Amino acid sequence: MDNNETEPRILLVEDDKADREKTLEALRKYGLGYEVRVVTGGHEALDYLLGRGRFHERSRNPLPDLILLDMSLAPIDGARVLARIRDNESLKAIPVIILCSTPEERGRAMVESVRAHAYAVKPVSADDMRDLVRLTYPSVTSYAAMRFE
């Protein structure tokens, strides 16, 4: 996060509209002061993170402080997106919470295999989302209203 900014940025990468709305609703419930950007696919996520195409203006499309990443994206899945993130020097330190539909036991193994910070089984409750974000990005202390773009 830039020193001039006070609002932590979250990038939500989710292609399913219903899951996207449920995740946004979970984030909104506590109004924890995040700026949430949404992209709907793996290619779009990489374009955003790498500042390509319509996301080329970094001042308008700043890097996130935290990424919420759906694992079942198509045509490029979340594991491949995360591998690209981890292989990029300017992106690899960004914490990533993977969002998956798999049972809890498989989710834990998936976190290790794809080098994520945490995982959540969809749909994610507001309480679980709050706890995951705070655990993964502990410097978030603001309780200001959220801004969605």
Placement of each model-derived feature along the sequence:
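Active-site residues of response regulator receiver
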Residues: 69-71
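Non-catalytic signal-transmission and effector/linker regions of two-component phosphorelay proteins
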Residues: 1-11, 17-37, 43-46, 50, ...
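The feature encodes the CheY-like receiver
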Residues: 74, 83, 104
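Conserved phosphotransfer cores of two-component systems
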Residues: 58-62, 86-93, 114
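Short, glycine/charged-rich "phosphate-handling" switch motifs in NTP-dependent
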Residues: 117
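Hydrophobic/aromatic residues positioned on beta-strands within the core alpha/beta folds
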Residues: 99-100
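Residue preferences within the helical output face of two-component receiver
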Residues: 23, 109-111
